[in-house]
Every structure is written in C-alpha cells, then in structure tokens.
C-alpha cells in the first residue's frame, strides 16, 4: 500500500513538473503593434490609393454632376415645361441609381483589395513569428491581445518586428 501511494505521489509530482517546463516555452507577441509599425503598411496604403484614384475621381465627378442636376430641378422645376421636368427627373433618378451601383462596387473592390494586402502582410508577420519562435525555442506563441498578464521577458514582439523588416 505504501509503495502504491508513493508511486502515485511520484506520478503526480512528475505531472506538475512537466507542466512547469511547458510554461517556460511560451512567448507573447503583439501582432497589432508589429502591423502598425511596418513601413510596408504605408506603402500598401499609397499603392491602393493610386490604384483606386481614377475610379474615385470618376465617382466624385458623377456626384457633382448629379448634384448640379438636382439643384437645377429644384431651382427651375416649377418654371420648366412638364415634359422637360419629367425628362430631367428621369435622368436624375437614372444617374442616382448608376452612381449608387458604381459607389457600391467601388467600396467592395476597395475593401477586397485592402483585405488581400492586409492578409499578405499578416502572412509575412506569421512567417517571422515562426522563425523567431524556432530560433528562440518557443513551443507556443500567443497574441498579446489574448493574454491578461505575461512576464515582459517572454515578449518577442521586437524580435519579430526586426525579422519582418
């Protein structure tokens, strides 16, 4: 009986010591901070701005044209012939619908491209995390936003940022 009790307590002690060893190989990284500090993020933002500049200016031109027609209708609608006013109202409605469709397509395309570029950058960050974790011997790397408390010595954000740059 004493041998069984001794073996059980030895097994429990082993289990607790294995957990303590695993905790030594956990690191924390702040992916959001790395993302914000990357110069590539600003370059991508400028690239997307240039990519969508023509469509944005076309939408602004369409909006200005639509606003001028609406103002003309409001200003001169009461003095216009009935057929002219009807034609202008139809034109305004058609332009408003066309503008809405183009604006929605623009927003969707812009959002899609932003997500593509963001995912490329996040993939680079993820690869850098794997490299740094492998070099420093960490088994688990957790995002700092998911951790309530961590020891500052186990934060590998700076190392990952250097690796990504």
Curated annotation (Swiss-Prot):
Gene3D superfamilies: Skp domain (3.30.910.20). It is found in: Periplasm. One of its GO terms (cellular component) is periplasmic space. Residues 1-22 form the signal peptide. The keyword Signal applies. GO terms for biological process: chaperone-mediated protein folding; protein stabilization. GO terms for molecular function: unfolded protein binding. Keywords: Chaperone, Periplasm, Signal. SUPFAM superfamilies: OmpH-like. It holds the Pfam family OmpH. Molecular chaperone that interacts specifically with outer membrane proteins, thus maintaining the solubility of early folding intermediates during passage through the periplasm. Belongs to the Skp family. PANTHER family: CHAPERONE PROTEIN SKP. This is Chaperone protein Skp. It comes from Photorhabdus luminescens.
